[in-house]
């Protein structure tokens, strides 16, 4: 049995080949873009040191106890940052995010030397609430560009507020 010139299978086959070639082209372009913007030979050279996350006394404005990863809703907590390991030619800020990605505490932006006296970054309960919302809280130290936009996370900690 011979295949005629008007066979619909040939058109479908060629269409599938065209879609496959287009898919491979998109994949190659994506890999090329990834290699260009994320070269394998370089890695992030800046790393900020988060000393720890501790219970916080708002009256005395001090941290206490051991470094922890879990807190109760009614406990105040804060991160302690060591700014001394960062060069002074960058702009940084330290930010607390709650489970809804709301900013619940921050220090900066500024150069590390300007922030040297602000080593304690507290996580505040949301406005109108007495306690922290339960869930995951992320503390991030970010490097900012000249426009004040975060371009790199150079330090990070995650803590959990339990119900």
Model-derived features with residue positions:
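N-terminal Lys/Arg-rich, disordered targeting/topogenic segments
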Residues: 1-13
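Hydrophobic membrane-insertion alpha-helices, especially the h-region
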Residues: 15-33
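Short, compositionally biased P/S/T/A/G/V-rich stretches that sit at domain boundaries
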Residues: 34-76, 162-163
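Short edge beta-strand/loop segments characteristic of extracellular beta-sandwich folds
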Residues: 76-84
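Short beta-strand elements
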Residues: 83, 149-163
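Conserved aromatic beta-strand anchor motif in extracellular beta-sandwich/beta-rich domains
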Residues: 94-98, 141-143
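Solvent-exposed serine/threonine-rich low-complexity stretches and specific carbohydrate-binding patches
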Residues: 104-117, 155-158
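Short, solvent-exposed, Trp/other aromatic-anchored flexible loops in extracytoplasmic proteins
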Residues: 112-147
């Amino acid at each position: 049995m011979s295949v005629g010139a008007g066979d619909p299978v040939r058109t479908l086959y060629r269409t599938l080949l065209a879609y496959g070639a287009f898919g491979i082209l998109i994949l190659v372009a994506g890999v090329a873009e990834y290699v260009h913007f994320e070269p394998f030979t370089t890695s992030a050279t800046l790393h900020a040191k988060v000393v720890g996350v501790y219970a916080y006394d708002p009256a005395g404005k001090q941290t206490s106890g051991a470094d922890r990863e879990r807190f109760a809703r009614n406990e105040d907590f804060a991160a302690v940052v060591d700014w001394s390991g960062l060069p002074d030619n960058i702009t940084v800020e330290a930010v607390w995010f709650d489970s809804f990605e709301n900013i619940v505490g921050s220090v900066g932006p500024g150069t590390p030397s300007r922030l040297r006296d602000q080593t304690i970054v507290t996580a505040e309960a949301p406005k109108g609430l007495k306690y922290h919302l339960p869930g995951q809280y992320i503390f991030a130290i970010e490097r900012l560009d000249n426009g004040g936009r975060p371009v790199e996370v150079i330090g990070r900690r995650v803590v959990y507020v339990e119900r």
